[in-house]
Each structure stands twice: as C-alpha cells, then as structure tokens.
C-alpha cells in the first residue's frame, strides 16, 4: 500500500429511502480501507434518481467542496459506477481525484492478483473500464500518479489512445482464451478421474479460504481484508478412509460486482457452474448476512450455476455472541461451522459424503481372476472398500457411480 494515504470522502445517492445506502457506504468504506485509503468523510443525498450529469445535485456539490476543504480530502469515491460525463463534470467542479466503486474494486483486484491468469483478467477489466472513460477522466490521468485507483498492469497504459487500448484488449482476450482452454482441459481431467468437485462460494471475507485450509491444510492466504484471494485453488479432501472429493475455492462475491470484472473473471467464476456441489460459505457474525446471501445466489443465477446440491456453512460461529440455528431454505444442508475451532467440519464432510453416496450403487461381488480390469475400473472411478483373494476369485465390496454400473 502507499506510504501517503489517500484521504477520501465517500458519496452515495439514496433513491429508495431505506438504509441500503448507509449499508452500502459502510462496505465502500471497508473497500477503501482495503485499498489503503483513509476515509475522512461521507455524504448521502436522498434523490429520486441519480443526477445524469454530476451523480449528486449542485447543492450537494457545494457541500462536498466545503467538506473536502475542511478534511483536507484528496479525492472522492462514489458508491455507484460513474459515466465518463459524470466523472468529468465532478472533476471540473471539485478539482480532486474522482473514483467510483468499480475503479476501487478493480484497484484491489490489481493489488491481489498473483497468477498469470489473474493479472490478465484484471488488466483486461481495467482497460475496458478506462477505455470508455478516457474523455471523462480528463486531468485525472495526470493525477493518477499515486494513491488508490492506479495499481496493476493497466496503470502504465492509461495514456494510450483508444486504438492502442483496443489492440491491447484484443491481445489480452487471446491470452485469456489460451488460459480458458487450459482450464477446460483440467476440468476434463477431473471428470475423467471420477472425483466429484465441490466449489466454495460466498460473499467476500466469509471465510472460504479458512474453511479450505482447515480441511485440507492447503496453505491458502487467509485475511480479514476483502478479496484476500483471487486465484482459485483446488485440493483433494478425504471424506472417509477411501472416498475423496475435490474442493475448489473461488473469488468472493460482492454487491454491485463490476460487470467488467464478471466478464474478465468469467472462467474463474464458472468453477461454480461446472462443480457438482455448491458449498455456500456465509459469515454468520455479519449483521448483513441475509443481504449478502441474496447477492451470492443472484450471482450464481447470473453464472448459470443453479439446480445443484447446495450445502450452506454458517461460518465464523466463534464470533457469534448468541448462536442461532440458521437454516438456508435454498440449500439441501445447513451447518454451523467455525474454521477456527473446527466446529461443524466433520458434519460438513458427512454431508458431502451423503450427497456422493446418493449417486452411487453399493456392490458386493465375486470376480474371476481374469476380470482384474473391472476391479481396476472400480478403483479408478468408484470407491473400493475391500478386495479379498479367495480360491474362487476376488471378493469385492465397493461404491460405484451409476454410469459404470452396467460395465461391471
């Protein structure tokens, strides 16, 4: 993070008269903190509609000018995605750095991207966002020499003209296609292995990485900061003596997730779409738990990841003062967990095993010694519980997938 912190004022428009704007601004403050900024003020304007030219009304702009002066603010962050016109007009009126929620999230993603795929995805999203706002950014191009909103591979390319940006976007898309083909190949290999895949999904900072680490000792970065991990990780998890499942951690969801990011991170987010089981990790200690769960299910719907078996983990029970037996009506299983204490993790593994068993057939058979190939098929695609050599052949007890049962 930068040594000299950006001093920002958060700005939102309340169009429905509820407390949603306040909650959203609280989250924006957490995002700003994650990006390394210091929040020195906040402002909410009740309006029927967002002002098409300046986001907020002229009276509020005057108030904002005074607040910037009083707090020695260096920039503002608006809670909605600004158009190039709004950005340009606000900059002309306020003479400071203008950012919006989308640019802030892009900045955080740029700081957290580790893998080659992650860096490509972030740069692509940054360039697409900025290409449509070159005119609106105006003098901000020269302001973006430091502070939030400037990180990542995209920062050196801000002053490209549109043609060069289009060329760069085209190259990045081709690179991403290669990465996506590799990801599809990996998915195909997983399918061939016969192992089921469970995707950990959830609102950012719900504790997905903590759950994965507690179960598999994966060593994935854990952090209370938002979007601490961007890159997906897949680890094998042993459910009982012989049955394994692949556990995949995915990028966290958030309210108003920028469409540029959804598009750029499509191959990563689609891990949930291609998984056999969805594991919805919820921060049970967060007062906005219900609203966050709604965002997760809405995002899954947009990704086409519906109609799957769902296990909801009401996580961070160690932080809940008055534990409640929550039940997610959209899930097949609801389990109270704590990655820190281990609460509920064995119950979670049992639920995973139960889902797998529903799609398997239990067999007890005596195979001739010449049928070793069938036993090898069971070993590679199913769960071989035991094999005992007797004078008549090989006695086998196993769980096998329905699709290979006829070949045994």
Whereabouts are the PLM-identified features?
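Canonical P-loop GTPase G-domain recognition
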Residues: 96-146, 306-311, 316-369
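Alpha-helical coiled-coil heptad-repeat register
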Residues: 121-124, 128-131, 135-138, 159, ...
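N-terminal accessory targeting/assembly segments
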Residues: 1-107
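Flexible beta-alpha connector loops of hexameric P-loop NTPases
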Residues: 15-19, 50-54, 112-116, 156-157, ...
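NTP-binding/hydrolysis catalytic cores, primarily Walker-type P-loop NTPases
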Residues: 359-408
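Conserved G1/Walker A P-loop phosphate-binding module
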Residues: 3-5, 143-262, 266-273
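Conserved C-terminal guanine-recognition region of P-loop GTPase G domains, centered on the G4
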Residues: 24-33, 65-70, 82-96, 242-243, ...
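Conserved nucleotide-binding/hydrolysis micro-motifs of P-loop NTPases
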Residues: 14-18, 47-49, 81-84, 103-106, ...
